[in-house]
Amino acid sequence: MERRLVKQEVKRLLGEYIGIRLRENEFDPKGRGQLTFLDDMVNQVTLAHYDLAISVASQWLDCSENLTWLQWEKVRAPLHVRPAYPNRKEREAMILSSYAGVLMNSIPIEEVLKIYGANSSASPDSTKVAQALLPRRSLHPFAMLTAPRAAECNRRQSVKLRRGATNKNTTSSSTKKATGQNGDPVGKGTHTPATNISPTPVLSSAQPFHSSTVMWRNLESAQRQMGLEGK
């Protein structure tokens, strides 16, 4: 009995390890990967699941129609039927939408707001943070969202962007000092009448990169919560 349980546990652990390694190998930040014969076979099988999910979701969203047609005998679709969403981007958009729903149900709403670049309005020190424009990571959404290397890639990118912002701020401050020393009219003592209008707040250029740091941290925490991170 114990040997059988140990064998099942080892088999499960090997399956999880191999699955994580496959997802890591599929992680393609530059989108240069080529589809193999195995990928084509997997796509053939998953297209049926895509079509079934899309058809059920479309009927569920349309409240005007009767949902009595949702029976197993009627929703079964043959594999040779042309998919309703043959476009790769549309299929990946549906995958990302489904995965986003899973993440939003598994993490607090405050963390979700941080991912989208804004803190919760309920907190007193909430400040709006501009979103970071990060490049597209991969053409394989599942590989990106489940591979542990995706979070590390995001972290390195955020560090690189933060360094660029620091260098930009240093260059800007040195330019302002040089302008003031070379005869700026304001620096010579020109009087500016005081007004009650407060200056327009300027967002720090480092704020967008704080959003990117929060994104990869939340991605790592979501992976740990859902058991998708490699052991």
From Swiss-Prot:
Span list, region Disordered: 153-206
A Pfam family: DUF5563
Classification via InterPro entries: C2orf80
Highest taxon of source: Eukaryota
Compositionally biased intervals (Polar residues): 192-206
Disulfide bonds: none
Organism: Mus musculus (Mouse)
Biased composition (Low complexity): 166-179
Protein name, entry field: Uncharacterized protein C2orf80 homolog
